[in-house]
């Protein structure tokens, strides 16, 4: 095992990232060292690149970033069982305490003591990453690595989309970023009748259509209610997935839900968003906040891909990790889906 490795690092407090040589992590008791094959750039990685307020509050440079990845086990720490060296794996990015009430009920995503890989501790944009064995997820060899590289984001979409029953339902998704687009595919796969996605970025709507949604609406140019009529909706949407964190999108979503409709909220806003409580109460709406993934979502993701859910339309760019700057430029251009970095060459 070599002692030094390439890694994409947040070097100092300020915009930008650097490719540096850093020590290869050594797995302690109960930990697993993973050799990285592919990684994917997440929106939070872009926040760290730009060094926005959220990043300033969470990241302590110098630090290796990144939390979406697939690879193989390189070394097992003392006491680790159930895994083998060379086995293909990914990992849950929230390292949790395991003893709080939420952890005990299986809601690890709400653990108040969680530590984020690539945010609060060194991450996966490197040749190797080290995580606790309980966070390691075995990945079947039949699954394409480019897709598995963004299972973390896929998990957010899965958690959001499957929060409420979908069979025969009409679904509105506000926000056609990669997670929103993936959610559109999940909803159709899970039996939704009509799936409509909205955005004001024309580029993002085309891959949403390739994922199988019934209508992709640019709300800056098109009338959503007209599209609803064309799709045969008479009372509004049964299920809403708010993925944008945008106030205007949220308010429009609430306005077109049927009475008794259910809404999953994943998109984080830049600030507080006002809510008309009277509208929610009188229409009997259910609003559910979504954060991260439940461990069962990892199994659901693998089974959906094995069952035929094709997520490749979400991938728009592929680069070698040494060209990571091109990947971040693509992400920040507003004209990208998932960007995958290759660490195998």
Feature roles, as predicted:
Residues 25-39, 54-101, 140-142:
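Glycine-rich beta-strand-centered segment in the early N-terminal region that forms part
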Residues 226-234, 270-317, 325-326, 335-336:
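C-terminal substrate-binding/catalytic core of Rossmann-like NAD(P)-dependent dehydrogenases/reductases
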Residues 257-258:
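Helix-to-beta-strand junctions that scaffold the AdoMet/dcAdoMet cofactor pocket
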Residues 261:
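Glycine-centered, small-residue-biased loops immediately flanking beta-strands
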Residues 97-174:
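NAD(P)H dinucleotide-binding glycine-rich loop of Rossmann-like/cofactor-binding domains
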Residues 143-221:
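Mid-domain Rossmann-like dinucleotide-binding core that forms the NAD(H)/NADP(H) cofactor-binding site
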């Amino acid at each position: 095992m070599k002692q030094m490795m390439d890694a994409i690092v947040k070097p100092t407090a300020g915009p930008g990232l650097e490719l540096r040589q850093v020590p290869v992590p050594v797995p302690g008791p109960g930990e697993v060292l993973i050799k990285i094959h592919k990684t994917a750039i997440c929106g939070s990685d872009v926040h760290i690149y730009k060094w926005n307020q959220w990043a300033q509050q969470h990241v302590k440079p110098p630090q290796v970033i990144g939390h979406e990845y697939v690879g193989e086990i390189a070394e097992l720490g003392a006491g680790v069982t159930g895994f083998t060296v060379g086995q293909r794996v990914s990992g849950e990015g929230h390292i949790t305490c395991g003893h709080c009430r939420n952890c005990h009920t299986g809601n690890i995503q709400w653990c108040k003591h969680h530590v984020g890989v690539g945010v609060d501790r060194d991450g996966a944009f490197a040749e190797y990453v080290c995580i606790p064995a309980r966070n390691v997820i075995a990945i079947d060899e039949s699954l394409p690595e480019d897709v598995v590289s963004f299972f973390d984001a896929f998990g957010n979409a899965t958690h959001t989309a499957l929060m409420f029953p979908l069979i025969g339902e009409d679904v509105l998704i506000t926000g056609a970023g990669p997670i929103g687009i993936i959610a559109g595919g999940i909803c159709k796969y899970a039996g939704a009748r009509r799936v409509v996605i909205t955005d004001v970025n024309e580029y993002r709507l085309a891959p949403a259509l390739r994922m199988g949604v019934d209508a992709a609406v640019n709300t800056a140019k098109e009338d959503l209610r007209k599209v609803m009529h064309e799709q045969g909706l008479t009372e509004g949407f049964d299920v809403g997935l708010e993925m944008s964190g945008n106030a205007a999108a949220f308010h429009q979503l609430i306005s077109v839900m049927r009475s008794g409709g259910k809404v999953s909220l994943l998109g984080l806003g830049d600030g507080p968003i006002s809510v008309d409580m009277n509208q929610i109460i009188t229409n009997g709406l259910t609003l559910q906040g979504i954060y991260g993934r439940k461990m069962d979502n990892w199994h659901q993701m693998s089974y959906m891909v094995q069952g035929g859910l094709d997520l490749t339309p979400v991938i728009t760019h592929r680069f070698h990790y040494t060209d990571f700057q091109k990947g971040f430029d693509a992400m920040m251009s507003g004209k990208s889906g998932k960007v995958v970095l290759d660490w195998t060459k």
